[in-house]
């Protein structure tokens, strides 16, 4: 109940403008009841982030297990879903403080290499090798390289920049992945990422 209320408030008002009192008022619980579960707004935000992460994992599992798609199509779908219009903006609005938190980067890096890539991305790449849609001798290394770049460098939420610099990043990412035969980031998706950035 507390996390659902917090997630709604973060989405509506943004993290910065949501107070712990707002969350308490929305739940109808006493201050003591909320403090029994959570010590701070930051702790609530971390749990909201965990819930969002669980939804992402379910989406990745659905894509990985979709028998109708080739390995390459699965990777393209991962990019399309993660860059859906509105999804990035919602995350940026809800949890903007994460890009300033070194602990978040450490957790994100660990989660990517220990969970996301081995459980979801590598199987998609292995399938792509088997069905001929992806050429690589190192599915694990390819998955790690692409998704570390995408998540920690290409993503303007984790590495804020200007629209012009974001377009340059997208162009380099497209050149690199296309050289590997992987058409992952469309021009429209690149423009959506640039639109998330603030001009200098």
Predicted regions and their residues:
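Helix-turn-helix
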Residues: 1, 5, 9-43, 47-51
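Conserved hydrophobic residue
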Residues: 16, 29, 130, 134-135, ...
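Hydrophobic alpha-helical connector segments
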Residues: 47, 51, 61-92, 143-146
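Hydrophobic/aromatic residues within well-ordered alpha-helical segments
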Residues: 48, 52, 56, 78, ...
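All-alpha amphipathic helical-bundle segments outside canonical DNA-binding/catalytic cores
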Residues: 72-73, 112-113, 126-145, 163-168
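Short, well-structured alpha-helical segments
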Residues: 76, 122, 139-147, 190-194
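Short secondary-structure transition hinges
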Residues: 84-134
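C-terminal peripheral helix-coil segments that are non-catalytic and often amphipathic
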Residues: 119, 123-131, 159-200
